[in-house]
Each structure stands twice: as C-alpha cells, then as structure tokens.
Amino acid sequence: MNCQSGLRWLVTLCAFFQVGSARDTHESTRQCDKPVSQKDMNSFLWTVKRPRPFPPSYLFGTIHVPYTRVWDYIPESSKRAFQTSNSVFFELDLTDPLTISKLTSCQLLPNGENLQTLLPRDLYRRLKRHLDYVKHMMPFWMTADQRGRGLYADYLFNAIAGNWERKRPVWVMLMVNSLTEADVRSRGTPVLDLFLAQEAERLGKQTGAVERVEEQCHPLNGLNFSQVLFALNQTLLQHESLRAGILQGTFTTEDLIAHYNCGDLNSIIFNHDTSQLPHFINSSLPDHERLTAQQIDSYLRQELIYKRNERMARRVSALLQRNPNQSFFFAFGAGHFLGNHSVLDILRQEGYEVEHTPPQEPIIQSWSEREATTLNPTEDSFESVTEWTSETPELEEISQEELSHMLLPDSLSQLEEFGRYKHPRKTHHTHSRPRLFSDLWVRIGDSTTPHPSIRITNGYVTVEPPQIRQEQQQRLRERLKPLSEPTNPSALDSAAPNPTYALTCFLACLISQLLFAS
C-alpha cells in the first residue's frame, strides 16, 4: 500500500517530533490497546512469491524504537516468516563490529579538526550551552527502570554525545536530535532492528546487509559547509524553542509507536520517520533561507530515498536470483515500503509478485523451504556487498515522498553496546569463488623459498630459519650415511623398505608444510 498521493514530502518546521517535557510525550499521544485477535493486528509484512518449487521470501517493515514497545503487536505471521527463513538481511550488518568502527570514523572531522575552530563562535557557544543543558537534565529524564539496571546519566550522555567536538557538524545536528527526553528514556533496550539481528544470530541464521556504511554516510557528508551550518542552526533554534515552551512537537516517538501498532499503512507518519532527519522548510523563513532549505530537502530526498530504494531493491533482486532455493527475510525501515517509488514498486517493475501479507494469514514451511536449509552455502553463495557498485541512475524527482527510515547516529550507541560482545569479526571475502583445498597445494608447490622448520614441543611452537634446517639435514645425512651403506650383498637384500616408516615420514612432512602455509 502506498501513501496518499496528496501527501507532501516535508511538513512545516513545527512538525518535529522531539518534545521538551514528559507531559507532552506521554499525555498528549494516543495509546494502543492490545489487539484481541490476530486479524486486529497491523501487518508490515509483504511476501515475494516465486513459482514452485522455490520458496517465498519476505519483506518486513521496522521502526527505530525499543522492540519491547511493539513486539506484542507484531502478528504471528510476521514472526513465523522470520523463523522459517534461511537468511535475514538488514540495511546494515548490525552484528559486525566493522560496521560500528566504520560508522564512527565516518562521523569524525578530517585531519584532527574540531568544532570549536570550525564553527562560528556564536553557533558553537549555543551548541555547547544546549549540550550542557541536556547533560544537566539527563538524571531527571532517566526512568527508575534504567537506574535499576545500572545505567547512569553520565554513561548515557557519553554514549550519545561522547567526543562531539570531533564530529562533523551534520552528525552533531543528528546527535542533538537524539538528545531528547523521549530518546533518553528509551535507551538500554535494543531497537527493533537490532533485536531481530540478535535473534537471527542466536538462531544460527545467515545474516547480511544490502547496504554499505559508506552509502549511508557519504550523502550526509556531501552537503556543503554553508548548508550544514544552516541545518545545524535551524536544529538548535528548534530545540531552543522547545526548551522555552514556544514550540511543541507535532509528531512524537509515541505517535510513531501508536501508528505502527494500531494505525494504518497509509499514514504520513512512517515517511516522516521521527527518529531521523529534521525538516527545515518553514513559511516564516526569508526567501534566501527558504531556498537553502529546499536545496537541502531536495538533495536528501534524492540521496536518502530514491537512490537508496533503487539500490536496495536491486540488491534484493540479485540475492533472490542468485539463491532461488533460499528463503529470505528482509527487515528494512517501514518507510522504504511506503510511498511512491518504494522498494515494493521497484521489485514489481522488475516482474516480482509482491503481495501484502494479512496478519491472520498462516506462514507454512513448505518442503522446498525445508530442503533449502540443507543447501551447501558454497553452491549458493551470497553476493558480497563489497562487489556491489554504489552508482545508481538519476531518478526523476517525486514531490510526494518523505524521508524514509534510516539507521543514523541515534542508534550508534546501541550498535556499540552490542559490538562490545562481538569479539570475532566476520570474514570479508573479495574473491568470486569458494577457496578450494587444492589452492593450498598450488601455493606450496609453486613456492621456491625453502620452508622453515616448525616444531611443537610441550605446547610451544618454534620456527628455525630455512638455512639452518638445510645444514642440519645435511649433517644428519652424513651421520646416517655409514649406517645406511650395506656391508655385504645379504645385507643389501635384507634392507627392504619399511612402508610404515615411509608413511610416517610423509605425514610428518605434510603436517610441517600445512603448518607453514597456515
């Protein structure tokens, strides 16, 4: 289902989700009653049907809120589709610590620069004043449950705003948007995307991503300096107005949760994802500032919606084509499946049969799906993300679309928290075929360098240089030469080769070569 055609991509400046008080957050929003039956639930699941015997795959829309706020409202059909799928793919690989390090480095200013020397003095002072206010308010914003779980205000502040003076201004702007009472109260619980990633890993499913970190980072870093200063200034003005009680947010995180749990798929709020980018267009702006706001909105709409939807749909299609026997579960932000030129639209244009899955519809694991679970991964290997090109054709501007869900810095501390428990890194292969055991023999056979001598004594590994090894072997042969020469013909006849000894020597040589190669 698509958004109503009359919806605009951006709303006015006051259509901003952050609110300055708990009263606005908790009392002015509609709460959902838990549905009585499955058919009363809201389904954000779409099925990609394929001809038999190939199994179906699924597209699931998420929102960036603590999973505990929405999990009980997600239909069993969506949960069943997740459980029966062989592979689960996200926008980014949330289980890979490399994702965290790349997100962090992408946000930092180059060459050791800092905001104090980069920003105009007045703007820097206002920013620091606002962050000092947030740090002061953090203990009062935290919930009793958070304090009971051992979370501290200073820890939360540093998790979100740590090292802020070294970050690029555009990322500081987004950081400011995540330093609100509503967001602080939600910290400590994995958001829905991250929870699904953790569950997929716990269940031993194949996980992956359809985007690279750079593809989400670079468009934001592509704004010019004057545009970034304008955006940061407008963001601070909004929050300063909220603090002063002059401005109140229209769309709140609570509104987003309520619409996800019991709203309808045509709601504007999913494309106005409230945990993400602020909106700057305001009729009260002077003409030159309104033009700057429109340029920023147009740029972000093109880079963060149309190009991403095109890229994500193309990579979903590639995975389905390369792995016809696999059942996939793609969990993306709900905004990517709503509105014009969505991921669903693009897949349908490519010939896929994509249908919305009602909440009461059963998900049955067919024989083909059970068979797919035994496939050799080397036969149906996934296309490496590093092999995908980030170039996408320019899309026509569509005026009736809004910013989609995007994993941005308000989730970075959640990723960092998860990443601390992920010591081993995933192996990133750049080759196009699986490595064979015969490759090892090719490398050994082609080598012209003498191999070192490797010994394991009492659990310790010692390596001797090749030249020393050759000298020792030569001395050993000289000592054994008199013993090996027969003294009479009868001795020569009795010197039959011992097959057990020969096999032992061969195995010892093989093990030493393998140890060297590894």
UniProtKB/Swiss-Prot annotation:
Metalloprotease that acts as a negative regulator of the Wnt signaling pathway by mediating the cleavage of the N-terminal residues of a subset of Wnt proteins. Following cleavage, Wnt proteins become oxidized and form large disulfide-bond oligomers, leading to their inactivation. Its EC number is 3.4.-.-. Its cofactor is Mn(2+); Co(2+). Residues 1-22 form the signal peptide. Residues 23-499 are extracellular. GO terms for cellular component: organelle membrane; plasma membrane. Keywords: Cell membrane, Glycoprotein, Hydrolase, Membrane, Metal-binding, Metalloprotease, Protease, Signal, Transmembrane, Transmembrane helix, Wnt signaling pathway. This is Metalloprotease TIKI2. Belongs to the TIKI family. It is found in: Cell membrane. PANTHER family: METALLOPROTEASE TIKI, METALLOPROTEASE TIKI2. The keyword Protease applies. GO terms for biological process: negative regulation of Wnt signaling pathway; proteolysis; Wnt signaling pathway. Divalent metal cations. Mn(2+) or Co(2+). Residues 518 are cytoplasmic. InterPro entries: TIKI1/2-like, TraB/PrgY/GumN_fam. It is a single-pass type I membrane protein. It is an enzyme of class 3 (hydrolase).
